[in-house]
Amino acid sequence: MASLYVGDLPQDVNESGLFDKFSSAGPVLSIRVCRDVITRRSLGYAYVNFQQPADAERALDTMNFDLVRNKPIRIMWSQRDPSLRRSGVGNVFIKNLDRAIDNKAIYDTFSAFGNILSCKVATDEKGNSKGYGFVHFETEEAANTSIDKVNGMLLNGKKVYVGKFIPRKEREKELGEKAKLFTNVYVKNFTEDFDDEKLKEFFEPYGKITSYKVMSKEDGKSKGFGFVAFETTEAAEAAVQALNGKDMGEGKSLYVARAQKKAERQQELKRKFEELKQKRHESVFGVNLYVKNLDDTIDDDRLRIAFSPYGNITSAKVMTDEEGRSKGFGFVCFNAASEATCAVTELNGRVVGSKPLYVALAQRKEERKAHLASQYMRHMTGMRMQQLGQIYQPNAASGFFVPTLPSNQRFFGSQVATQMRNTPRWVPQVRPPAAIQGVQAGAAAAGGFQGTAGAVPTQFRSAAAGARGAQPQVQGTHAAAAAANNMRNTGARAITGQQTAAPNMQIPGAQIAGGAQQRTSNYKYTSNMRNPPVPQLHQTQPIPQQLQGKNSEKLIASLLANAKPQEQKQILGERLYPMIEHMHANLAGKITGMLLEIENSELLHMIEDQEALKAKVEEAVAVLQVHRVTEPAN
């Protein structure tokens, strides 16, 4: 198997679109578009797994930078080991690029020096180039060759710089060491009459000056700041220590410090801002409350009045838009954590105005996102464990057998197909002959399930049920013979080692005509194990006959809204099977099981749109055909 990373994807591209594109290069095992845990929006990249490395290499060579939704995609080999990606070996940094140079232009320029693993031009939120980029070569030799050849060259009329990539931590460490050896000084907060000569006279006592400049406006007036460059580091440090904070009159205090580049200054300001924000958050932690679902008539004063009985309030604010209308939420800050806790206990859910309030401790955006992500992952883990621990017995209303492990994969390559059961997930609803309407006999299915959802026949149960209760005789031998004949006709087979009932034998679990109904068996027939006990699940309500009509989508949607997740799949399966059976009767069971891996919303769309269903069915048939061709002979 070979895996490719596909980046720079538009937000609306999904697995289906990528499958259509990459399947032309060769058999695709799986495709996964990476999405946000909470919003499920695409993160802009995906992984495509090919069966053969040659097919993946063909896709990389022929499809890299192809347009998808009028946007070029970026393809490279997937590096699963993060140490290889972050080592910096073979990585080259390019800056001073022309704004017209994109990823493809960089790739075409540098591919002459060696095999490129990845290349990227940095862009802003609008997709405009930031003027720098990166190229990752397979070998360090190719990277060094590109530096020697391209550094100082003209690309689109601009002289570019090409050098070895230095990780951010090393750059910051290097800048920190350089910061101690500065000679250039930044000066601000002096009066408007300060010119270049006055600036020189002011700083000259602290050492030899190589250059000095007061920045001025177009009319010649000072902007209030300037620069002084000393010959030695000692002189610059002495000037900073002596003059920083000096009173300049007119209420101004002189600011003198090491001159910084814009990016360095912005980074330092950002770091200080984060520190202040963290301190402010820590100071109000446990005392600041978030209040939402506020009535439109509630303002700051009414919010304070509502919360004032529970403690001393330091601030209360209802958030408003530009026109002063309430946004429906606000914040209340108490003096003590115990007061805030009391307010949450008493006011959460209480009606204030005309709406019940939601009151909780305020959280930062990052904390709230992390908390929601944690909740979502716990919920998904619980659902997986619940499905893993349950074995479902097909009941009279459905033939759906839930897969042991859930899967979000929509496309099934040959490797996935080899893991499929020989028997489909869908068990046929076997209608017993009239002579044995009460007999319950278990059998493993070999075909699909009954297409008609209304008037569902009684399903055969395991013959082992009689081992735990009374074993009444069936009057006559015709019922047993008919049951055995019916099982042969439906393709059912008994479990290995299970004795078949002879015509004159007693049938365990059978019902005497006109007698009371036997209790349902707690055993289940499978093709590879002996009658494992299964937990009793409640019977789902059979789907009404009217759902088989044309105008049934609204009724199905209403049933799904009131059903549990397992029952939703059963309802959709009962509706899909007869539609698929008309297209491919022999494969209807397997195809239905494959399609039920898809999300319910898309299944509903396929029920309404015959063309969409037909396309998806043909796709599943193609996968099964590939599986049959590639499956080794037994």
Swiss-Prot record:
The residues covered by the RRM domain are 2-80, 90-167, 181-259, 285-362
User: Kinase: is it a keyword of this entry?
Assistant: no
Where is each PABC domain found?
552-629
Q: Which InterPro entries match?
A: Nucleotide-bd_a/b_plait_sf (IPR012677), PABP-dom (IPR036053), PABP_1234 (IPR006515), PABP_HYD_C (IPR002004), PABP_RRM1 (IPR034364), RBD_domain_sf (IPR035979), RRM2_I_PABPs (IPR045305), RRM_dom (IPR000504)
Q: Which UniProt keywords apply?
A: Repeat, RNA-binding
- Name one molecular function that GO assigns to this entry: poly(A) binding
Q: Name one GO cellular component term.
A: cytoplasm
Decide whether keyword RNA-binding is in the record: yes
The processes (GO biological process) annotated in the record are: chemical synaptic transmission; dorsal/ventral pattern formation; male meiosis cytokinesis; male meiotic nuclear division; mRNA splicing, via spliceosome; oocyte development; oogenesis; positive regulation of translation
UniProt feature coiled coil, ranges: none
When the coding gene is removed by deletion, what phenotypic consequences does the entry describe?
Answer: RNAi-mediated knockdown results in increased incidence of spermatogonial tumors in testis.
Q: How does it assemble?
A: Core component of the neuromuscular Atx2 complex, composed of at least Atx2, tyf, pAbp, Lsm12a. Interacts with Atx2 (via PAM2 motif). Atx2 and pAbp form a subcomplex that can associate with the 5' cap of pre-mRNAs independently of tyf, Lsm12a or me31B. Forms a ribonucleoprotein complex (RNP) containing at least me31B, eIF4E1, cup, tral and pAbp; this interaction is required for the translational silencing of maternal mRNAs during the maternal-to-zygotic transition.
What protein family is recorded? Belongs to the polyadenylate-binding protein type-1 family.
Its job = Binds the poly(A) tail of mRNA. Since it interacts with the cap-associating translation initiation factor eIF4G, it is likely that it functions by linking Atx2 to the cap-binding complex. Forms a complex with tyf and Atx2 which functions in adult circadian pacemaker neurons to sustain circadian rhythms likely by switching between activator and repressor modes of post-transcriptional regulation via interaction with Lsm12a or me31B, respectively.
Its recorded name reads: Polyadenylate-binding protein
